[in-house]
Amino acid sequence: MGEGERVREHVRVAVIGSGFGGLGAAVRLRREGITDFVVLERADSVGGTWRDNSYPGCACDVPSHLYSFSFAPNPDWPRTFSGQPAIREYLEHVADTFGLRRHIRLNHEVRMMRWDADELRWEIETAGGDLTADVVVSATGPLSDPKMPEIPGLAEFPGKVFHSARWDHDYDLAGKRVAMIGTGASAIQIVPAIAPEVRRLTLFQRTPPWVMPRTDRAITAVERWLHRQLPFTRAARRGLLWGIRELQVSAFTKRPNQLGLIESLAKANMARSIKDPVLRAKLTPSYRIGCKRILLSSEYYPALARPNVDLVASGLKEIRGSVLVAADGSETEIDAIIFGTGFHVTDMPIADRVVGAEGKTLADAWKDGMQALRGATAAGFPNWMTIIGPNTGLGNSSMILMIESQLNYMADYLRQLGVLGGRVALAARPSAVNRWNRHVQARMERTVWNTGGCTSWYLDAQGRNTTVWPGTTGEFRRETQRVDLAEYEVVRVRGREPVAAVVAPAGVAPGAARLPGALPPDPRASNAGEAEFASGGASNAGGAGVAPGGASKGGGTGVAPSGAGVGEGGA
């Protein structure tokens, strides 16, 4: 080593992101006995999308007792659908309870990561310094980078402009003429929250969403006491919420015509609040319910009926000074513009900063559409996996269930590397990646997302659905329980003979093959009741004691996107 050079820090695993995916990965690593890891977070605190999205009314549209880790149940959720403050507090408690703080590197945005084929490790450049890692777990999530549309004249607009995921709390909306661009999951929360205080609110709607009422309420003190003292009541509540959603899946994936009854209920819900037939016609979708995410709100339609709220059933075409011009030619003078136009879901910006074994970026490898083996590993990117990867999203349930399934896969992947021993990498075979994705896309053909007659953020530039999982969470759990080494090439440092892949013997289901001496999966990984967010709850995985009370603040109003996070909708 030359004078002036320094030895870069090396870790076994580098986790990117500290939302549900990143913190969940960190907990699972500790449970697997792995402490040589870091969590690289670009912001100055943990929380992911629940840190970034703090707009008025921000909340989750999956019930709180299902939208939480099975290994960290919280008996003190304040509401059926808890607000952003409570969810963010829950994630902070997870970081504290499981002793994760010492692993987390705040203000360490990843600038570039490159695979070193000679040393079989990842070289990572961050805003806080460089390091290397044997394995990278990318948990940046699909709802991390806001998408701003290119609108002619936007740069010259003299008023205030911001995205819902970058809410400017210093800007006072009171008495202002405000434009809301988009009618997705963020917008239906923001509109009811700000309508009473603004002078005039103009909502630009390109495509109307289907909206169902939200059955939200405060969780009583008696219920919370029962969940603390009798954990089976909490488990039963979670199990019921999960089971109902599993039973709904077939209507979305196999028999979309069954959704007609739900459409009738949605129309009746609209009619109760919107008496004007002209406005009601503008708000009625022309596509099958479920094709886009079904939104939940009991406040959105009443807000649209307010005298100071206008609906423009057209997209925003251009801006001339302070005048917004819609595609239908209508003009509206505005003081502030709020964009609720979603995120870079199928074109994640971090993909430009991941360079694989062949010198190509992940963005280049995915230029014709994202695809990953079991939603986790990509061909050409050894020892790299993603949490909430391609085709792992859900249309009606909790993304936390999918995250925990992927953590099972991550844990077995690391066990296999440990059993192989030495400096080694697992590289997803292109044939296995293609076979998996053909299987997923074949199942996608009958789903409402592909046949419902809409264009949604689930689809990529080629019109392929690379976002949603076309099955139940139980099916995905089974598909990701084990790593099938037949789907991987085992790579050694050059000059050493590679170890042959282990193929499942006759009679053993794919994915069940084990190398001699491989450890069984940690049975604690997906069982509820491990750590409890309540007074006196015991922690595990080497964490410190659990903070009393848990995430009990902030009920919040409105409903946000489900398991996937917040603000999924487009204009």
What annotation goes with each model-predicted range?
Residues 5-10, 14-16, 20, 24-45, ...:
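Rossmann-like dinucleotide-binding core of oxidoreductases
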Residues 79-143:
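Feature captures the FAD/FMN-dependent oxidoreductase FAD-binding
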Residues 210-213, 223-224, 231-232, 372, ...:
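C-terminal, flexible cofactor-proximal segment of oxidoreductases
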Residues 340-414:
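Glycine/threonine-rich phosphate-binding loop and adjacent beta-strand/alpha-helix elements that clamp
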Residues 508-509, 525-567:
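Long, intrinsically disordered low-complexity tandem-repeat segments
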